[in-house]
Design a protein with these regions (language model features):
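Self-maturation zones of extracellular/virion spikes and adhesins
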Residues: 1-85, 102-104, 108-115, 160-166, ...
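Generic structural signal for coil-to-beta-strand starts
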Residues: 15, 72-73, 95, 147, ...
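Small/polar residue-rich beta-strand/coil "junction" motifs that cap repeat-based extracellular fibers
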Residues: 77-79, 89-99
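Residue "hotspots" at secondary-structure boundaries inside conserved domains
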Residues: 88, 138-141, 199
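Terminal (often C-terminal
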Residues: 95-161, 182-184, 217, 222-236
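Exposed aromatic-hydrophobic patches
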Residues: 192-198
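Noncatalytic modules at the cell exterior or secretory-pathway interfaces
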Residues: 199-212
Length: 236
Protein backbone atom coordinates (compact mmCIF):
# COMPACT_ATOMS: atom_id res chain seq x y z
CA UNK A 1 0.00 0.00 0.00
CA UNK A 2 1.61 3.26 -1.15
CA UNK A 3 0.37 5.43 1.71
CA UNK A 4 0.55 2.68 4.35
CA UNK A 5 -3.06 3.00 5.44
CA UNK A 6 -4.15 -0.54 4.50
CA UNK A 7 -2.69 -3.40 6.52
CA UNK A 8 -3.12 -6.76 8.20
CA UNK A 9 -1.30 -6.89 11.52
CA UNK A 10 -0.91 -9.44 14.31
CA UNK A 11 -1.15 -7.76 17.68
CA UNK A 12 0.60 -8.92 20.83
CA UNK A 13 -2.80 -9.91 22.28
CA UNK A 14 -3.17 -12.76 19.75
CA UNK A 15 -5.56 -10.74 17.62
CA UNK A 16 -5.35 -10.02 13.91
CA UNK A 17 -6.43 -6.52 12.84
CA UNK A 18 -7.46 -5.63 9.30
CA UNK A 19 -7.34 -1.97 8.28
CA UNK A 20 -8.44 -0.52 4.93
CA UNK A 21 -7.94 3.15 4.02
CA UNK A 22 -6.92 3.97 7.55
CA UNK A 23 -10.05 2.43 9.10
CA UNK A 24 -10.22 -0.73 11.18
CA UNK A 25 -12.72 -2.98 9.36
CA UNK A 26 -12.25 -6.35 11.07
CA UNK A 27 -10.61 -8.16 13.95
CA UNK A 28 -9.92 -11.89 14.17
CA UNK A 29 -9.18 -14.00 17.25
CA UNK A 30 -8.90 -17.76 17.64
CA UNK A 31 -12.69 -18.02 18.02
CA UNK A 32 -14.29 -14.81 16.80
CA UNK A 33 -14.44 -12.60 13.70
CA UNK A 34 -15.80 -9.07 14.13
CA UNK A 35 -16.68 -6.80 11.20
CA UNK A 36 -16.62 -3.12 12.07
CA UNK A 37 -18.08 0.01 10.52
CA UNK A 38 -21.52 1.60 10.24
CA UNK A 39 -22.96 -1.00 7.83
CA UNK A 40 -20.87 -4.20 8.02
CA UNK A 41 -21.67 -6.49 5.08
CA UNK A 42 -20.56 -9.97 4.05
CA UNK A 43 -21.06 -10.83 0.37
CA UNK A 44 -20.77 -14.44 -0.78
CA UNK A 45 -20.51 -14.88 -4.55
CA UNK A 46 -19.73 -12.59 -7.47
CA UNK A 47 -23.07 -12.54 -9.38
CA UNK A 48 -22.07 -15.64 -11.34
CA UNK A 49 -24.44 -18.51 -12.18
CA UNK A 50 -23.36 -20.66 -9.26
CA UNK A 51 -24.57 -21.92 -5.91
CA UNK A 52 -23.19 -20.34 -2.74
CA UNK A 53 -23.54 -21.62 0.81
CA UNK A 54 -22.45 -21.53 4.43
CA UNK A 55 -21.91 -24.94 6.04
CA UNK A 56 -22.16 -25.50 9.80
CA UNK A 57 -19.87 -28.44 10.53
CA UNK A 58 -21.36 -30.20 13.56
CA UNK A 59 -20.08 -33.19 15.48
CA UNK A 60 -22.97 -35.51 14.59
CA UNK A 61 -24.73 -33.57 11.84
CA UNK A 62 -23.95 -30.76 9.39
CA UNK A 63 -26.38 -28.05 8.26
CA UNK A 64 -26.26 -25.46 5.51
CA UNK A 65 -27.74 -22.14 4.41
CA UNK A 66 -27.31 -21.36 0.76
CA UNK A 67 -28.44 -19.99 -2.59
CA UNK A 68 -29.80 -22.52 -5.07
CA UNK A 69 -29.00 -20.44 -8.12
CA UNK A 70 -30.81 -22.66 -10.64
CA UNK A 71 -34.10 -22.22 -8.74
CA UNK A 72 -33.37 -18.70 -7.42
CA UNK A 73 -34.20 -19.81 -3.88
CA UNK A 74 -32.57 -19.46 -0.48
CA UNK A 75 -32.56 -22.84 1.25
CA UNK A 76 -31.87 -24.13 4.76
CA UNK A 77 -31.18 -27.83 5.07
CA UNK A 78 -29.32 -30.77 6.53
CA UNK A 79 -25.89 -31.90 5.39
CA UNK A 80 -23.09 -30.10 3.59
CA UNK A 81 -24.48 -30.52 0.05
CA UNK A 82 -26.82 -27.75 -1.04
CA UNK A 83 -30.40 -28.84 -1.78
CA UNK A 84 -30.07 -32.51 -0.83
CA UNK A 85 -32.25 -32.39 2.31
CA UNK A 86 -34.02 -29.04 2.27
CA UNK A 87 -35.92 -28.12 5.44
CA UNK A 88 -37.04 -24.65 4.33
CA UNK A 89 -37.01 -22.82 1.01
CA UNK A 90 -37.59 -19.10 0.28
CA UNK A 91 -38.34 -18.10 -3.32
CA UNK A 92 -37.88 -14.73 -5.03
CA UNK A 93 -41.45 -13.70 -4.15
CA UNK A 94 -40.97 -14.37 -0.44
CA UNK A 95 -43.01 -17.58 -0.46
CA UNK A 96 -41.77 -20.09 2.13
CA UNK A 97 -42.15 -23.86 1.73
CA UNK A 98 -41.18 -26.66 4.11
CA UNK A 99 -40.76 -29.84 2.03
CA UNK A 100 -40.29 -32.13 5.04
CA UNK A 101 -42.90 -30.61 7.38
CA UNK A 102 -45.23 -33.45 8.48
CA UNK A 103 -48.40 -33.16 6.39
CA UNK A 104 -50.62 -35.84 4.83
CA UNK A 105 -53.93 -36.42 3.05
CA UNK A 106 -55.37 -39.91 2.49
CA UNK A 107 -58.75 -41.19 1.34
CA UNK A 108 -60.71 -44.34 0.50
CA UNK A 109 -61.08 -45.51 -3.09
CA UNK A 110 -63.44 -48.37 -2.14
CA UNK A 111 -66.12 -48.83 0.49
CA UNK A 112 -65.48 -50.66 3.76
CA UNK A 113 -68.04 -53.03 5.29
CA UNK A 114 -68.30 -52.66 9.07
CA UNK A 115 -70.00 -54.89 11.63
CA UNK A 116 -71.51 -53.72 14.88
CA UNK A 117 -69.59 -55.94 17.29
CA UNK A 118 -66.43 -53.83 17.66
CA UNK A 119 -65.02 -50.37 17.20
CA UNK A 120 -63.47 -50.50 13.73
CA UNK A 121 -60.35 -48.84 12.32
CA UNK A 122 -61.19 -46.92 9.15
CA UNK A 123 -58.80 -47.96 6.39
CA UNK A 124 -57.29 -45.71 3.73
CA UNK A 125 -55.79 -47.07 0.53
CA UNK A 126 -54.89 -43.90 -1.40
CA UNK A 127 -52.42 -41.15 -0.48
CA UNK A 128 -52.79 -37.79 -2.18
CA UNK A 129 -49.61 -36.66 -0.41
CA UNK A 130 -47.53 -37.60 2.64
CA UNK A 131 -44.65 -35.22 3.33
CA UNK A 132 -41.95 -36.83 5.47
CA UNK A 133 -43.68 -40.25 5.06
CA UNK A 134 -45.28 -40.30 8.53
CA UNK A 135 -48.52 -42.06 7.51
CA UNK A 136 -48.65 -45.82 6.98
CA UNK A 137 -50.97 -48.79 7.58
CA UNK A 138 -53.89 -46.41 8.34
CA UNK A 139 -51.94 -44.73 11.16
CA UNK A 140 -50.12 -41.39 11.49
CA UNK A 141 -46.98 -41.53 13.66
CA UNK A 142 -45.70 -38.22 15.07
CA UNK A 143 -42.01 -37.76 14.16
CA UNK A 144 -41.47 -35.04 16.80
CA UNK A 145 -43.20 -33.75 19.92
CA UNK A 146 -45.63 -30.95 19.09
CA UNK A 147 -49.18 -29.80 18.40
CA UNK A 148 -50.88 -31.53 15.45
CA UNK A 149 -54.08 -30.63 13.62
CA UNK A 150 -56.21 -33.47 12.26
CA UNK A 151 -59.37 -33.32 10.19
CA UNK A 152 -61.52 -36.03 8.67
CA UNK A 153 -64.71 -36.72 6.80
CA UNK A 154 -66.47 -40.08 7.13
CA UNK A 155 -69.35 -41.05 4.88
CA UNK A 156 -71.53 -43.98 5.97
CA UNK A 157 -74.55 -45.79 4.57
CA UNK A 158 -77.08 -48.43 5.69
CA UNK A 159 -76.73 -47.76 9.42
CA UNK A 160 -79.95 -49.09 10.92
CA UNK A 161 -82.44 -46.90 12.74
CA UNK A 162 -82.61 -46.50 16.49
CA UNK A 163 -78.92 -46.11 17.34
CA UNK A 164 -75.92 -43.83 17.02
CA UNK A 165 -72.93 -43.44 14.71
CA UNK A 166 -69.73 -42.40 16.51
CA UNK A 167 -66.39 -41.42 14.96
CA UNK A 168 -63.21 -41.26 17.06
CA UNK A 169 -59.67 -40.02 16.84
CA UNK A 170 -57.66 -42.72 18.64
CA UNK A 171 -54.41 -41.11 19.81
CA UNK A 172 -52.03 -43.55 21.51
CA UNK A 173 -53.68 -44.03 24.93
CA UNK A 174 -56.33 -41.33 24.45
CA UNK A 175 -59.70 -41.57 22.71
CA UNK A 176 -61.35 -38.42 21.38
CA UNK A 177 -65.02 -38.66 20.39
CA UNK A 178 -65.14 -36.27 17.47
CA UNK A 179 -68.56 -36.95 15.91
CA UNK A 180 -71.87 -38.48 17.00
CA UNK A 181 -75.08 -38.79 15.00
CA UNK A 182 -78.42 -40.24 16.05
CA UNK A 183 -79.68 -42.74 13.50
CA UNK A 184 -83.27 -41.57 13.95
CA UNK A 185 -86.32 -43.58 12.95
CA UNK A 186 -85.64 -44.22 9.25
CA UNK A 187 -84.99 -47.71 7.95
CA UNK A 188 -81.47 -46.70 6.97
CA UNK A 189 -79.19 -43.73 7.45
CA UNK A 190 -76.91 -42.00 4.97
CA UNK A 191 -74.64 -39.42 6.47
CA UNK A 192 -71.26 -37.73 6.63
CA UNK A 193 -69.37 -36.78 9.76
CA UNK A 194 -66.80 -33.97 9.36
CA UNK A 195 -64.47 -33.40 12.28
CA UNK A 196 -61.26 -31.58 13.27
CA UNK A 197 -59.11 -31.25 16.38
CA UNK A 198 -55.69 -30.04 17.57
CA UNK A 199 -53.86 -32.67 19.63
CA UNK A 200 -50.70 -32.52 21.77
CA UNK A 201 -48.50 -35.48 20.78
CA UNK A 202 -45.12 -36.80 21.83
CA UNK A 203 -42.66 -38.20 19.31
CA UNK A 204 -43.76 -41.71 18.22
CA UNK A 205 -47.36 -41.18 19.39
CA UNK A 206 -49.93 -42.38 16.86
CA UNK A 207 -53.31 -41.22 15.61
CA UNK A 208 -55.91 -43.21 13.66
CA UNK A 209 -59.57 -42.84 12.77
CA UNK A 210 -62.21 -45.24 14.14
CA UNK A 211 -65.96 -45.71 13.81
CA UNK A 212 -68.49 -47.41 16.08
CA UNK A 213 -72.27 -47.81 16.32
CA UNK A 214 -74.89 -49.37 18.55
CA UNK A 215 -77.37 -49.89 15.71
CA UNK A 216 -78.56 -53.32 14.64
CA UNK A 217 -77.06 -54.73 11.46
CA UNK A 218 -73.92 -54.08 9.47
CA UNK A 219 -73.20 -50.86 7.58
CA UNK A 220 -70.53 -49.46 5.28
CA UNK A 221 -68.03 -46.61 5.24
CA UNK A 222 -68.28 -44.98 1.83
CA UNK A 223 -65.46 -44.34 -0.62
CA UNK A 224 -64.47 -41.31 -2.77
CA UNK A 225 -62.14 -38.49 -1.81
CA UNK A 226 -65.00 -36.10 -0.99
CA UNK A 227 -66.79 -38.56 1.35
CA UNK A 228 -64.15 -40.31 3.47
CA UNK A 229 -60.72 -38.76 4.01
CA UNK A 230 -58.17 -38.13 6.77
CA UNK A 231 -55.59 -35.34 6.88
CA UNK A 232 -53.18 -33.79 9.36
CA UNK A 233 -50.14 -31.60 9.81
CA UNK A 234 -47.72 -30.29 12.44
CA UNK A 235 -48.85 -26.90 13.78
CA UNK A 236 -46.15 -26.01 16.31
Amino acid sequence: DADADTSITADTDDQVDIRVGGTDVATLTNSNLVLKGTTPTVTIGDAGAEDAKIVFDGNAQDYHIGLDDSADTLVIGKGSALGTTTSMSFDANGIITKPLQPCFFVYKSSSQDVDTTNTTDITFDTERFDLNSDFGSNVFTAPVTGKYHFSASVGYVNAQAGGNIMVYFQVSNAEILAHRKDAGSDDSVYGTGQISVVIDMDASDTCKLQIDTNTDGDYAVESAVYRTYFSGYLVA
